[in-house]
Amino acid sequence: MRHIKVNVKGQVQGVGFRYFTQQAATENAIVGWVRNEDDGSVLIEAQGEDKNVDAFLNEVEKGPTKFARVQDMEVKELAEDTELTKFEVKY
């Protein structure tokens, strides 16, 4: 099991990034959340099986459309959180 926090920087707001991230999480059996940050980045907390988290990160790095552009992804490893049960978009 892998639990991470990811700060995604680039053109990632106003391009459907959060909903794309939620879809990628669902497809890869990931629980956690995603939200826009005031600095223009997107913050993601994600937890799942190691291979699923890797696949999820690959999808997130590609982005939802040609209008989205991921310039940097800072990944921080966290301790497992047993209270995460679904993936949601936070506001």
Curated annotation (Swiss-Prot):
Reaction catalysis annotation: an acyl phosphate + H2O = a carboxylate + phosphate + H(+)
EC assignment: 3.6.1.7
A molecular-function term among this protein's GO annotations: acylphosphatase activity
Residue ranges occupied by any Acylphosphatase-like domain in the UniProt entry: 3-91
Domain of life: Bacteria
Keyword field contains Hydrolase: yes
Keywords, alphabetical: Hydrolase
Enzyme active site: R18, N36
InterPro entries from the UniProt entry: Acylphosphatase, Acylphosphatase-like_dom, Acylphosphatase-like_dom_sf, Acylphosphatase_CS
Hydrolase among keywords: yes
Uppermost EC category: hydrolase
SUPFAM superfamilies, alphabetized: Acylphosphatase/BLUF domain-like (SSF54975)
PANTHER family the record matches: ACYLPHOSPHATASE
Protein family: Belongs to the acylphosphatase family.
Name by which UniProt lists this protein: Acylphosphatase
Source organism per UniProt: Oceanobacillus iheyensis (strain DSM 14371 / CIP 107618 / JCM 11309 / KCTC 3954 / HTE831)
